[in-house]
Amino acid sequence: MNTHPYIRAFLSGIFVPTLLLPLLLAGFVLLRLVLRAPFPIERGLIFPMALAPVLWGLWSMLWLRSHAQTGLPLGVHGAILPFLMLPGGTLIGRHVGILVLGARSVTWFEAVRIPYALIGCAFAFAVVAYYLAWKYIVGTLNRVLGIA
């Protein structure tokens, strides 16, 4: 089964975010419509929901392409992705006006202030979560699809 390995790599990469994003959407709908959150979450939700699976799929394809030269384990490769997503998301958020960077915190939707210390803790958690997801879930899918 050596036909179309990059398509199979893309499919194994999009598996995790495609399963998790509907749960995230349900949480945001609950927050916005049921709990009446006073800020427009939907402005900052649609673009990341469309972009995250594509990034994961392309990142998986990149691993397949570069693994022979780099020898980088899949979990480590996956843990690098948040280091690209955080600056990219911050740049896009500032450009569209949903993020304002302050001296000690980030203001989100002109309503919620998030201290940089909390962002740092969440980022560290994300790096570990990405490592585990890529090592165990995407790695298993790669083996099942015959590309690992």
Range-by-range predicted roles:
Residues 24-32, 87-117:
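Alpha-helical transmembrane segments and their membrane-interface junctions
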Residues 102-148:
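Alpha-helical membrane-associated segments of multi-pass integral membrane proteins
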Residues 1-51:
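N-terminal signal-anchor transmembrane alpha-helix
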Residues 19-23, 27, 55, 84-88, ...:
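Lipid-exposed faces of alpha-helical membrane segments in multi-pass integral membrane proteins
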Residues 31-38, 62, 66, 70, ...:
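Membrane-interfacial segments
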Residues 57-94:
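Loop-to-transmembrane helix junctions at the membrane interface
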Residues 3, 7, 11, 38, ...:
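Structural motif marking the loop-to-transmembrane transition
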Residues 23-28, 55-59, 130, 134-138:
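Alpha-helical transmembrane segments of polytopic integral membrane proteins
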